[in-house]
């Protein structure tokens, strides 16, 4: 990454992680990061697709899984090894500024696979259902953004 982009990235991280904080977000953000927190939503989504769309719903689920796998592999196997940005909690120059609410993972951190995967789900669902439900666009983007923000927070 270029020097100016790295500086912007660090400054943005410090602002979100250290300054834009609150007791409510301290409670909410770890929940949003927890994959089990979203299990009921995914169960509802899969049930909804199967009940309302039968065989086509199963195909939608299959493509949803493929979209997530593709997004995850793209972020984890292609982008992260080339960008090689350490997680802020593991970066010796940055970790003194990090406020951790959950444990610190290993490996590289850009892009966030959680954020990439959830934005992939949001775009896929919006593509499927926007013509029927216009509200899905702002809701899905807000959902994916909230998860992305919680990864930084």
Question: What residues fall within each predicted segment?
Answer:
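N-terminal transmembrane-helix/juxtamembrane module of multi-pass inner/ER membrane proteins
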Residues: 1-42, 75-106
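Membrane-helix interface segments
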Residues: 24, 54-60, 131-136
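Alpha-helical transmembrane segments of integral membrane proteins
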Residues: 29, 59-63, 67, 135-139
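Hydrophobic, aromatic-rich transmembrane alpha-helices
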Residues: 41-52, 118-127
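Interfacial segments of alpha-helical transmembrane regions
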Residues: 46-75
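Transmembrane helix-loop junctions in multipass membrane proteins, especially transporters and channels
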Residues: 54, 84-89, 131, 152
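Juxtamembrane membrane-interface segments at transmembrane alpha-helix termini
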Residues: 71-80, 148-153
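Membrane-embedded catalytic cores of phosphoryl/pyrophosphoryl-handling enzymes
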Residues: 99-153
């Amino acid at each position: 990454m270029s020097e100016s982009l790295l500086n912007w990235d660090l400054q943005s991280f410090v602002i979100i992680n250290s300054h834009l904080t609150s007791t409510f977000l301290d409670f909410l953000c770890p929940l949003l990061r927890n994959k089990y927190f979203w299990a009921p939503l995914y169960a509802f989504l899969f049930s909804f697709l199967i009940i309302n769309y039968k065989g086509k719903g199963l195909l939608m689920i299959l493509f949803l899984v493929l979209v997530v796998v593709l997004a995850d592999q793209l972020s984890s196997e292609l982008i992260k090894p080339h960008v090689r940005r350490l997680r802020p909690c593991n970066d010796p120059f940055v970790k003194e500024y990090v406020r951790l609410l959950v444990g610190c993972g290993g490996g590289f951190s850009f892009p966030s696979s959680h954020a990439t995967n959830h934005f992939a789900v949001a775009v896929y669902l919006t593509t499927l259902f926007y013509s029927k439900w216009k509200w899905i666009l702002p809701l899905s983007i807000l959902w994916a953004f909230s998860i992305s923000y919680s990864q930084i927070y």
